[in-house]
Amino acid sequence: MSAEKSQNVQDVFLNFIRKNKTPVTIFLVNGVKLQGIVTWFDNFSVLLRRDGHTQLVYKHAISTVMPSTPISLFEPPIKENGEE
């Protein structure tokens, strides 16, 4: 087994948007839309900050996390003119 700890896509995604302070829209399973910046997360919850207020959102209530800008986690970014 590798000494390197493998990460799941959820952790890689959330850590990327946290580090880059990417604004996100989070849709809950009941249809509620939350917007803000992810400041922290663990296996069960996400902290979302907006306008100086922090919300604790349980992951089991989240349907979708949508960043405000496109992100590229595992693929090289595509340049504006179509070149790689």
Swiss-Prot record:
Primary gene name: hfq
Alphabetical keyword list: RNA-binding, Stress response
InterPro entries (UniProt xref): Hfq, LSM_dom_sf, Sm
NCBIfam families xrefs: Hfq, PRK00395.1
Pfam families per record: Hfq (PF17209)
A GO-annotated cellular component: cytosol
Record carries keyword RNA-binding: yes
Known function: RNA chaperone that binds small regulatory RNA (sRNAs) and mRNAs to facilitate mRNA translational regulation in response to envelope stress, environmental stress and changes in metabolite concentrations. Also binds with high specificity to tRNAs.
MF GO annotations: RNA binding
Protein name from the UniProt record: RNA-binding protein Hfq
GO biological process entries: regulation of DNA-templated transcription; regulation of RNA stability; regulation of translation, ncRNA-mediated
Protein family: Belongs to the Hfq family.
Assembly and binders: Homohexamer.
Domain (Sm): residue spans on this chain: 11-71
Top-level taxon of the source organism: Bacteria
